[in-house]
């Protein structure tokens, strides 16, 4: 039995249900990402939605938001990151988590042979935020940008079909993630 779910183990939803929930998530959370995803072939588009749903759910859980909306005061950031990490680890192991966004991670990771390190690296970025960590120098800034965006660039490249072994291509995808995050910081 599973105490976190009232003694009942969650059942893995059908892939189509996860894709449907992920499609709703991206449509609600990011009109620009949703529009851009229409340029992909169906299989890549669905995987992009699955990855987005997980990233959005993690960010919202840690920040106390709903699809990037108004924040609520978060007094338990460490517990929230611990929960994100536990659900993500379970999803990567192929277990049903009881949360469609985390189950979506399990599906997209299995379908693409996603290296778990990128998932953990993004979660480490959430940990930096939970710790209220601030960069002290340029190297720290790049470190932060890697964790919150570069790792996502790598995961998105894999979703788009880059084999996980193609480090040079993944390095360029990481650079794009860093550039997006630096632009976000400069805009803010």
Predicted regions span which residues?
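Acidic catalytic motifs of isoprenoid enzymes
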Residues: 2-186
């Amino acid at each position: 039995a599973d105490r976190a779910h009232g003694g009942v183990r969650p059942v893995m939803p059908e892939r189509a249900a996860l894709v449907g929930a992920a499609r709703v998530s991206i449509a609600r959370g990011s009109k620009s990402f949703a529009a851009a995803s229409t340029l992909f072939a169906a299989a890549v588009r669905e995987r992009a939605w699955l990855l987005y749903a997980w990233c959005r759910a993690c960010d919202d859980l840690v920040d106390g938001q709903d699809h990037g909306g108004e924040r609520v005061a978060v007094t338990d950031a460490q517990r929230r990151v611990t929960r994100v990490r536990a659900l993500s680890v379970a999803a990567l192991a192929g277990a049903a988590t009881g949360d469609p966004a985390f189950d979506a991670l399990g599906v997209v990771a299995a379908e693409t042979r996603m290296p778990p390190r990128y998932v953990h690296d993004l979660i480490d970025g959430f940990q930096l935020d939970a710790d209220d960590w601030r960069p002290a120098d340029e190297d720290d800034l790049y470190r932060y940008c890697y964790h919150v965006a570069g790792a996502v660039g790598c995961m998105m490249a894999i979703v788009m079909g880059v084999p996980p072994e193609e480090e040079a291509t993944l390095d360029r995808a990481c650079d794009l993630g860093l550039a997006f995050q630096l632009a976000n910081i400069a805009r803010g």
